[in-house]
């Protein structure tokens, strides 16, 4: 009887000791993907976005941060599919349904009400997962600008599917997209601006730029403001003509 009791004690000790490293490992992994801090995860900031609850989300080159006016909740990537796919944040976007989308250099995801993330597969060649920018059309389509590819979100399969395999015909490797009042998608790169009908993604216009564009902005969904090294252009997306630059700016 004594031998049986000693054997049971020994087995219990082995079971307890074998559980401890697993628990410690799980706790360590949890700390790796979630942290509460008085400071931001990285000083190199890439994007800002306010969500429906009023939290400020801040993307950096190393981690995502949610700020509540007192502290930062930091999020990092891991091998868990319920976490960020990558730590370098490219874009944070809230759509018309108040969903928060995050694009990284290693994939895209959507924030959930469980305080985790749903990673969204991207169906493009060469296993490219570098998301650059989210755009939403007036009829609720979510596009993913990957610079060299353009994808659209399929809610039935919960995937981003490629529309164009070559979305950068000028090979500039720098491109920003906008939706105008007519639900047209405009793609701006350093040497040209292109217009697509977002309903069928047919190219409707392409305008070469007289100077290399370094920055662009869509104003009131009706005009593109395009900055070059020493000049500002204003392009009316309704008439598809360049407008006269205000004298105070042009001078």
Where are these regions (language model features)?
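Carboxylate-rich, polar loop motifs that coordinate divalent cations or form catalytic acidic clusters
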Residues: 1-251
